[in-house]
Amino acid sequence: MSAILKATNINKIYDEGAVSTQVLTGLDLTVNAGERIAIVGTSGSGKSTLLHLLGGLDTPTSGEVWLHGQLLNSMNETERGAMRNKHLGFIYQFHHLLAEFTAVENVAMPLLMRSEVSTAEARQQAIDILNSVGLEHRLAHRPGELSGGERQRVAIARALVTKPSLILADEPTGNLDYDNAQSVFGLLSELQSTMQTALLMVTHDRNLAALADRQLLLRNGHWENY
């Protein structure tokens, strides 16, 4: 299997005045093409911090994060942003959709950040993927006009519209009731498999984690036996 993402000896320390807090200690992780991995841990275990480092949203205190053979933490923010937009999709517990934009406009936005994609092309690709998540009748609706499950479907469509090689998902169903959570994760899994995109998700839900190919337990910033 080819590695999409590789992290080695990741440490993260936050300094607040004279107080230093080590959140992550000596973590290694490899994500292979098409793989589905769940990172499980309680609140405060460092899951979201790790996801931010792997996605180039922050840099480790020490250690290396490689994405498609390129060292993220040697890049400036503009370069990391370009790598994120090219290779990664993000899904969060709270959808982070822009309230003033329609579903189509929200989903098209990552494509419009690419100079080679026209507005018309971006819109059509957004419509196509919204159709694939069952929202063909909600294209012109704004987030406030959608249900919680529908908003998360829009977020999934936005994450996948650029055809990323890896999706990073932070509690992707954590804000939904059981039935909606099952439906949304089933949809995400189906699209991830169809598009041959790798998925790395953090969750506190072991039932959800059981659906992944691999489960990793993060406790107090260290890997432990799952």
From Swiss-Prot:
Transmembrane segments: none annotated. It is a peripheral membrane protein. GO terms for biological process: lipoprotein localization to outer membrane; protein localization to outer membrane. ATP binds at G41, T42, S43, G44, S45, G46, K47, S48. SUPFAM superfamilies: P-loop containing nucleoside triphosphate hydrolases (SSF52540). GO terms for cellular component: plasma membrane. Residues 5-226 form the ABC transporter domain. InterPro entries: AAA+_ATPase, ABC_transporter-like_ATP-bd, ABC_transporter-like_CS, ABC_transpr_LolD-like, LolD_lipo_ATP-bd, MacB-like_ATP-bd, P-loop_NTPase. CDD domains: ABC_MJ0796_LolCDE_FtsE. Gene3D superfamilies: P-loop containing nucleotide triphosphate hydrolases (3.40.50.300). It is an enzyme of class 7 (translocase). It is found in: Cell inner membrane. It comes from the Bacteria. GO terms for molecular function: ATP binding; ATP hydrolysis activity; transmembrane transporter activity. Keywords: ATP-binding, Cell inner membrane, Cell membrane, Membrane, Nucleotide-binding, Translocase, Transport. Belongs to the ABC transporter superfamily. Lipoprotein translocase (TC 3.A.1.125) family. This is Lipoprotein-releasing system ATP-binding protein LolD. It comes from Psychrobacter arcticus (strain DSM 17307 / VKM B-2377 / 273-4). The gene is lolD.
